A protein has these predicted regions:
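C-terminal alpha-helical interaction appendages
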Residues: 1-74
Length: 74
């Protein structure tokens, strides 16, 4: 997942305004106590950041593939 795909997925799932707040301010334990933005800046793979953000916000598994990306086979 590219950063641009991550941003689209965040906007699609959470809405543009709320999504920006989440990635900038929500500290996620699964990301080492970092925000999504800080984790990406630290080199954490973007797909891993997306999955952690989804888990932290209770996004159902079937919606975690991200906008424009195929859902994983079950």
């Amino acid at each position: 997942m590219k950063v641009s795909e991550f941003r689209l997925a965040v906007d699609d799932e959470f809405g543009a305004a709320h999504g920006r707040v989440l990635v900038r301010e929500l500290v996620v334990d699964e990301l080492g106590g970092r925000t999504a933005d800080a984790a990406i800046a630290a080199g954490v793979p973007v797909a891993q950041v997306w999955t952690a953000l989804c888990r932290a916000n209770g996004v159902p598994t079937e919606r975690r593939h991200g906008r424009g990306r195929p859902a994983a086979a079950s």
